[in-house]
């Protein structure tokens, strides 16, 4: 499933920089909006609506500061009948972090469950250690606030996001049982969920 962009839920896709410039694939998947999260992110195609976030794939990069604008961009796109591709360079770390933050906001699932759901459709994803810390911090301190903000700012969601993520979790469990993802490549450093203590991110004292 690593070839090309992958559908996560209705109106939300995850991919790499090549996917963001592939007109055939963009058209085939009905993409109208592109959220670019990479070094020197900039609009490329004139007929797309962009949100460009300049961010490095480094543990010291503060990506959570961009969660709210990213969530707004994705949600408004979907509510207006569009489809959003979120991408970074490889479609593994930065873009996955943003997608997970969005899924956390539109469902009741935590960051690890949302990341697992994404792995059901794109098995090799894996936010770096710093981004996982930021997702944990988001879950601990901000996600309920963002959920309330989303409910207050927009009409009732017509989407079945909770059910779709639940279905992805079931799919991932089935994949595990079938042994489809028990190869060493999938368990590589890039796709690993790191063991984080509950207050690990806060204890680091970082102002990323």
Swiss-Prot record:
SUPFAM superfamilies: (Phosphotyrosine protein) phosphatases II
Cell compartment(s), UniProt: Cytoplasm; Nucleus
Residue ranges of domain Tyrosine-protein phosphatase in the record: 4-144
Designated gene of the protein: dusp22a
GO molecular function: protein serine/threonine phosphatase activity; protein tyrosine phosphatase activity
PROSITE patterns: TYR_PHOSPHATASE_1, TYR_PHOSPHATASE_2, TYR_PHOSPHATASE_DUAL
GO terms classed as biological process: signal transduction
Catalytic residues, chain numbering: 88 (phosphocysteine intermediate)
Main enzyme class: hydrolase
Protein name listed in UniProt: Dual specificity protein phosphatase 22-A
Organism annotation: Danio rerio
Family (UniProt): Belongs to the protein-tyrosine phosphatase family. Non-receptor class dual specificity subfamily.
Cytoplasm found in the keyword field: yes
InterPro entries reported in the protein's UniProt record: Dual-sp_phosphatase_cat-dom (IPR000340), Prot-tyrosine_phosphatase-like (IPR029021), Tyr_Pase_AS (IPR016130), Tyr_Pase_dom (IPR000387), TYR_PHOSPHATASE_DUAL_dom (IPR020422)
Physiological role: Activates the Jnk signaling pathway. Dephosphorylates and deactivates p38 and stress-activated protein kinase/c-Jun N-terminal kinase (SAPK/JNK).
